[in-house]
Amino acid sequence: MTQFEGFTNLYQVSKTLRFELIPQGKTLKHIQEQGFIEEDKARNDHYKELKPIIDRIYKTYADQCLQLVQLDWENLSAAIDSYRKEKTEETRNALIEEQATYRNAIHDYFIGRTDNLTDAINKRHAEIYKGLFKAELFNGKVLKQLGTVTTTEHENALLRSFDKFTTYFSGFYENRKNVFSAEDISTAIPHRIVQDNFPKFKENCHIFTRLITAVPSLREHFENVKKAIGIFVSTSIEEVFSFPFYNQLLTQTQIDLYNQLLGGISREAGTEKIKGLNEVLNLAIQKNDETAHIIASLPHRFIPLFKQILSDRNTLSFILEEFKSDEEVIQSFCKYKTLLRNENVLETAEALFNELNSIDLTHIFISHKKLETISSALCDHWDTLRNALYERRISELTGKITKSAKEKVQRSLKHEDINLQEIISAAGKELSEAFKQKTSEILSHAHAALDQPLPTTLKKQEEKEILKSQLDSLLGLYHLLDWFAVDESNEVDPEFSARLTGIKLEMEPSLSFYNKARNYATKKPYSVEKFKLNFQMPTLASGWDVNKEKNNGAILFVKNGLYYLGIMPKQKGRYKALSFEPTEKTSEGFDKMYYDYFPDAAKMIPKCSTQLKAVTAHFQTHTTPILLSNNFIEPLEITKEIYDLNNPEKEPKKFQTAYAKKTGDQKGYREALCKWIDFTRDFLSKYTKTTSIDLSSLRPSSQYKDLGEYYAELNPLLYHISFQRIAEKEIMDAVETGKLYLFQIYNKDFAKGHHGKPNLHTLYWTGLFSPENLAKTSIKLNGQAELFYRPKSRMKRMAHRLGEKMLNKKLKDQKTPIPDTLYQELYDYVNHRLSHDLSDEARALLPNVITKEVSHEIIKDRRFTSDKFFFHVPITLNYQAANSPSKFNQRVNAYLKEHPETPIIGIDRGERNLIYITVIDSTGKILEQRSLNTIQQFDYQKKLDNREKERVAARQAWSVVGTIKDLKQGYLSQVIHEIVDLMIHYQAVVVLENLNFGFKSKRTGIAEKAVYQQFEKMLIDKLNCLVLKDYPAEKVGGVLNPYQLTDQFTSFAKMGTQSGFLFYVPAPYTSKIDPLTGFVDPFVWKTIKNHESRKHFLEGFDFLHYDVKTGDFILHFKMNRNLSFQRGLPGFMPAWDIVFEKNETQFDAKGTPFIAGKRIVPVIENHRFTGRYRDLYPANELIALLEEKGIVFRDGSNILPKLLENDDSHAIDTMVALIRSVLQMRNSNAATGEDYINSPVRDLNGVCFDSRFQNPEWPMDADANGAYHIALKGQLLLNHLKESKDLKLQNGISNQDWLAYIQELRN
């Protein structure tokens, strides 16, 4: 018995299996003759055509609701003011809460739940809102209820055509529900009203009040503008700029009118424009009189409101949904460039950025979301600005600087936008100059893009590059503008904000255009797009029940170990199930599946008995029993007592546990429970659909403690599959005459002569129909299956022809992949097609390539050269288990308490290694450690690195992009297989670093957050239902009894620190830590930034002396000194000796030499990292410094005072740099392949740890060190668990816990 044996059959898991369908006999001919494929293709096209029509309906409904909104906006205004006045967590949280209140209030109008409307209107809204996402949207009911939507006959026909096919819109529904959502979603109408437009309107009210207070005569000018435009005629100008009026500015129509008031109305050419308020103010300022000076001294530009969600921009109709030709791309871009020129967008942007020299930068804000992007662009490092701002805010704190205060500053930088003045003050004037240079450069490139001509086609690479270069330049300006896109709750300069909004609105299409043009230019020659098949049946394959075959039209067959799908099309316009005559099993034929299912007894039994309308009507006037005979093989009696049990006057029902708890009437509860269970059994024995079900395995009614326990045993019995043999001739005759469309359900495992392990989809599918599963259901076949069709791609046929040579993708070592950029060159060379000399890089690989003669024609991407049918079918695994797990983590934790010897697998996403794994036992001893760069003799790390470089180059050049997604997906699958094997082999838990705890994206491979999170999700999903292919089906771990080692996944946010046997620990201090002592570098080096701080830093050490015996230098310090330069690491040892190891030659276990104490440091030139590294020997450098300064050291005396006595800046700066390099434990250089850990402190045996010794009892390199300490953090987590009384992990691991634990363990 394995220790994990208790972790099976704990909860249900749903999966969708995917297969190809191969038409049999005359199936394809009949389908083509009936035109079903063309019909469903048209329906798929109509689906796309309908989306904007449906959006018009949604917009109409939104407008109708928004016209009724009446809210008091004072509380939201006050919350914004409080936050602007004092930006604290309290005021931010208060604002967030107030925004949520207003969003919910608007949402209530949509769903008919507001107190501001009558019951009748609320009821109407509730009904329409539900209908917007159901068949009522298509059958005309919603249109009739709305009354104001104008649709053409063609549009009405399109809508009606989906009356029975509404499932097409399931995903679209979810997306559009977000438009009406009260959640904080930027694409939701409530968000647009509350968080985008109200702050603008509020600012406009403030501007208006200040202007007419300072210059009362403006009131009349403003009123005249309103009259001239002819809007809001019954409302005074003061009312327009008051909060109650905002209720009238929620629809796009009203927003347009308001924006016309601010910006005026352009009329036909030759006709004077009707001026808006902003132009009136500009003209007033141009008079240069006293009034002009007053106006100019105040905020004097009103801010237009954003368009409402779902509103159209007709001016940009030339940007198509998808480009299909070179001409479409070029013509569209020409029109866009013309638009930008005509609107003087670039000139306006230039003027806007020039004005930053003369306005108050405390009211110009940078988005906190863009801080890292801006830092990379202006400072060459992503965290420079964040660090500078952090230091500035810390320096401004008064009193004791606590850990809590530091965390508060960190949170503020993470969640709050920052004004430009603070950024410049923190980072220095150099930043201001860098910003000016960057904006000038971006605008210059954008101007050049508008002036340059476009190519006439995009056939050649250089033509694509011309288009891309121009789009890059415009996109650069858009991204620059996006730096300033901030929450309007900031006290933003209204002038700047108004103009920025206008420019950004004009530049916004450049992003959409860029993506669509790039997708067109880089698309593959083949298409993976498929569309759904219905065969004129709206519910095709929605279920398999034998009684519903007529409606669902789908049946399954088995013959000689192969599986077939049958589709029964309409006959003469009518649905008709085929009637097959069963025959003897001994005769040749197909075994037809007969599927019986009575779903969810708790719901369906009452629905078919006590809750029937006739039963309810009977007991409203009678107390005598009623007999039901329709759908029953013999009459079912329902007594008044049984009826009342399920229809009590007051809840809870008497047979529910809630009744016993509420009343204490245990006896009455038990009697009612038994009576109801007896009734359900009586029902099932008489109901036509369920009479054949064997209920003999159920216990007597009195033995069930509650209804849930009873239904849990009953429901699995209500599902049953059986097979009957049908003569082959009968089936094939039906296929021949077109009454049955027959497809083989296919994947490569069903290919003739296939050998090897079947994939999981095959295992699930064959397991589903296995005798063991038919006898006791573990895998259930579900409804809602779908059929798809993918037309063949129109592409140039590429083939390896007979007599040619094929080139292996790997070299002779069967490990190293050939880079794609060299593969084609080598392939052409071995086939004598290369028109130039072989490159040096390719020639170096030539001796190690593997070639093979082509014995038959091999077509590239063959699967896309023919039409394909596909079948997606859902199943449920562990069908007899609960829908969801109960206290899964506590169950695991109880197991771990009983098995303290459980090993731990630590997993690190490395720097040089994609994934590194270390397995330790319960004492911390390393059992196994290895990199997963290479799996099954394939170097994924090199392949991914090559593919990433090729992909970047292709993206930059807009050439066809080689996919990296599939490569990463394949690698992740291999990694998970390796981890699972280790987990089962060692019966171990797995420990990962916590993504949500200060995650930093690394450079390549799978280290970026999205891919690493995908890896985690794949691992959780795999362990949700772990099937080991080699195991017998019913054995633990087999397909009918899979392991379940992780909890059901909901979201990473809700998961916390544990999912079953998968644990999460914070990443800090796992990689750059000494495994022998637990020492980590305690200093914050960015705080040591000038001569004074460096001198003060050195004064904080006790002594520095030369060890005569070892040739090392020893720097001693106590943790209670130098506190201002430390990270604040409680739990640290009180004192340490930092060792400058003698730089002498040592040898590893294989006799390979290395220099002790060597450090690898970045090469810095002109204050910037060059991307190169160099070797540094700190002890030798220190000796050279001391000899240069004439300081005697070989007597072992304290030399620190001598370094400090003359305030020699060179000596002090060099000494600080050497200390920093010595404390750098991790040393890596990709160019040389070095990556090691070398500790600067000795352990109890006097040894400075160095991974270069390659001792297998300790981490073998830097990434191994990370995985090892992640595993040790897991050990600490399990120790916490052992001390837990409630089997819960109350807290994670703090840095204090961790360092105290590891240092106590080692010292």
Curated annotation (Swiss-Prot):
The record marks 607 as: Binds sequence-specific recognition of both target and non-target strand bases in PAM. The active site is at residues 800, 809, 860, 908, 993, 1226, 1263. Changing residue 1263 to A: Nearly complete loss of guided indel formation; neither DNA strand is cleaved in vitro. CrRNA binds at residues 47-51, 175-176, 307-310, 752-761, 806-808. The keyword DNA-binding applies. Monomer. One of its GO terms (biological process) is defense response to virus. Its cofactor is Mg(2+). It comes from Acidaminococcus sp. (strain BV3L6). Residues 74-106 form a coiled coil. One of its GO terms (molecular function) is lyase activity. The gene is cas12a. Residues 885-940 are annotated as: RuvC-I. It catalyses: Endonucleolytic cleavage to 5'-phosphodinucleotide and 5'-phosphooligonucleotide end-products; RNA = a 5'-hydroxy-ribonucleotide + n nucleoside-2',3'-cyclophosphates. Its EC number is 3.1.21.1, 4.6.1.22. This is CRISPR-associated endonuclease Cas12a. Residues 719-884 are annotated as: WED-III (OBD-III). The record marks 1014 as: Binds target DNA. Residues 527-598 are annotated as: WED-II (OBD-I). Residues 1263-1307 are annotated as: RuvC-III.
